[in-house]
Amino acid sequence: MMKKDRAQKSTTREYIMKLIYQININKEDFETLEDKVDNFLKDNSEHIINRYKELALQYSKNTNLKLEDTEIEDVIDKKYINTVCKALKENHDKIDELINKHAKNWTVDRMPKVDVSILRLSVCEILYLDTPNKVSINEAVELAKIYCDDKSPKFINGILGSVVDEIGK
């Protein structure tokens, strides 16, 4: 069961990052984040379920994993999404300030939007969720390897490491 939970958490994290990205490129306010979740999940449910299945198989040693009847409710951690949305809505300015402070010679306005989305999610986790810092940083770096250019994983890792050092968690 543990591997399924890991696949669920990774899938959820990946798609909340995509929602943050969508809000960023559409120049929408984080006040609307919670309102957009259900439509975003519904519109992307097939992709989300397929990604979950891919990760569940990748993380599992069980080659007979039963995934045929997988529903969106099985693959998304709604509680995690709601917690992230609430924290981002209430604290996005503080999160961006922290990112700007630790991104030497960069600001969130000048960084690639995907990098910013990954950083916002990870800093949010580090500050406001019970996710272990190492897990949050590792997941952010893994997302950067998939969605960003070659320099981004190191860049993101450096910023997040610096944030963790500052807050002393």
From Swiss-Prot:
Pfam families attached to this UniProt entry: NusB
Biological processes per GO annotation: DNA-templated transcription termination; transcription antitermination
Record InterPro entries: NusB-like_sf (IPR035926), NusB_fam (IPR011605), NusB_RsmB_TIM44 (IPR006027)
Keywords, in A-Z order: RNA-binding, Transcription, Transcription antitermination, Transcription regulation
Cellular component GO terms, alphabetical: cytosol
Signal peptide: none
PANTHER family in the cross-refs: ANTITERMINATION NUSB DOMAIN-CONTAINING PROTEIN, N UTILIZATION SUBSTANCE PROTEIN B-RELATED
Function: Involved in transcription antitermination. Required for transcription of ribosomal RNA (rRNA) genes. Binds specifically to the boxA antiterminator sequence of the ribosomal RNA (rrn) operons.
Family that this chain belongs to: Belongs to the NusB family.
Listed NCBIfam families: nusB
Protein name: Transcription antitermination protein NusB
Taxon lineage: Bacteria, Bacillati, Bacillota, Clostridia, Peptostreptococcales
